[in-house]
Amino acid sequence: MIAASFLLNLLIYPFLINLFRKKSVGQYIRKEGPDLHGYKEGTPTMGGILFVLIGLLFGVLSKENGVILTGAFLFFLIGFLDDFLSIAKKNSTGLRAYQKALLQIAAASVVIAFSQPETAVDFFGIKLEMGAWYYLLALIVIVGSSNAMNLTDGLDGLAGWVYISGAIPYWFFLKEKGFSENIIILLSAGVLAFLIFNSKPARIFMGDTGSIALGGTLGVVSVLTKTEFYLIVFFPILVVETLSVILQILSFKLFKRRIFRMAPLHHHFELLSWEEEKIVAVFTIFNLISSLIALEVFGVIG
């Protein structure tokens, strides 16, 4: 099914790109973003609709955990709604920040309620009992993962390659621990096909439809497999990108000074005159090295 997911995405994307161009399903660029992105205005977006739906289809066929599929679908719907509103309003603003946050919290709450996870966590081999506080942690992990992937999706190929570089090693890690959550690898196959059309110059963007779904699914899987903290080492770039935004906001609010030229961090490097391809390569390699080290440390390889 992994190969089928890749091939199906590969075959359909050219038709989807042409369809979206004809229907003017294009990206609107944030005016406060780097001036270098102006040429991307109008590039077809919502490309995540294909690899997510195909991933979910094969997930159903492979009898994937129903709660995971439900969570993935809910976050897909949130991203789709955000993109749809942006296109309908003909600007870069879809859902307002508070609306998106409320929907993400609601989706995460549904997942937590139906999964009824145990309240102990695996902190890199140390079992910690958190009691009722665990539900807050689970909420933060799911919503945070969703937003982190969304923040990372700012350069051609960046979110896709970061996802691939962490998701495939993470999947092997889960298999070693006895879990059979295949949605991670099914989505990876679709994202790999998508990247053929998303690498610079991108012919299509995944949009929030793809990024919010990918991040949300990672968070849901980590909660159901009790590997919440392991996301940090398999997806350190998501953590770094998110922290750069938080630190930038706090620094400006408290000291009226910015730490970075622009946040998330990939925009900072853009404004330092790094080429997009270089940023994507460096971030992907960093994420991959961290993931491979994690596999060796946790006994999966080596």
Curated annotation (Swiss-Prot):
Pathway per the UniProt entry: Cell wall biogenesis; peptidoglycan biosynthesis
Transmembrane segments: 1-21, 42-62, 67-87, 101-121, 123-143, 154-174, 178-198, 204-224, 229-249, 279-299
Residues of the signal peptide: none
GO MF annotation terms: metal ion binding; phospho-N-acetylmuramoyl-pentapeptide-transferase activity; UDP-N-acetylmuramoyl-L-alanyl-D-glutamyl-meso-2,6-diaminopimelyl-D-alanyl-D-alanine:undecaprenyl-phosphate transferase activity
Protein location: Cell inner membrane
Protein's membrane topology: Multi-pass membrane protein
Record keywords, A-Z: Cell cycle, Cell division, Cell inner membrane, Cell membrane, Cell shape, Cell wall biogenesis/degradation, Magnesium, Membrane, Metal-binding, Peptidoglycan synthesis, Transferase, Transmembrane, Transmembrane helix
EC number(s) reported in the record: 2.7.8.13
Cellular-component GO terms for this entry: plasma membrane
Transmembrane helix among keywords: yes
The organism's place on the tree of life at top rank: Bacteria
InterPro entries assigned: Glycosyl_transferase_4 (IPR000715), PNAcMuramoyl-5peptid_Trfase (IPR003524), PNAcMuramoyl-5peptid_Trfase_CS (IPR018480)
Catalysed reaction, written as an equation: UDP-N-acetyl-alpha-D-muramoyl-L-alanyl-gamma-D-glutamyl-meso-2,6-diaminopimeloyl-D-alanyl-D-alanine + di-trans,octa-cis-undecaprenyl phosphate = di-trans,octa-cis-undecaprenyl diphospho-N-acetyl-alpha-D-muramoyl-L-alanyl-D-glutamyl-meso-2,6-diaminopimeloyl-D-alanyl-D-alanine + UMP
Amino-acid biosynthesis in keyword set: no
One BP term from GO: peptidoglycan biosynthetic process
Cofactor requirements of the protein: Mg(2+)
Family in the record: Belongs to the glycosyltransferase 4 family. MraY subfamily.
Protein purpose: Catalyzes the initial step of the lipid cycle reactions in the biosynthesis of the cell wall peptidoglycan: transfers peptidoglycan precursor phospho-MurNAc-pentapeptide from UDP-MurNAc-pentapeptide onto the lipid carrier undecaprenyl phosphate, yielding undecaprenyl-pyrophosphoryl-MurNAc-pentapeptide, known as lipid I.
Protein name (Swiss-Prot/TrEMBL): Phospho-N-acetylmuramoyl-pentapeptide-transferase
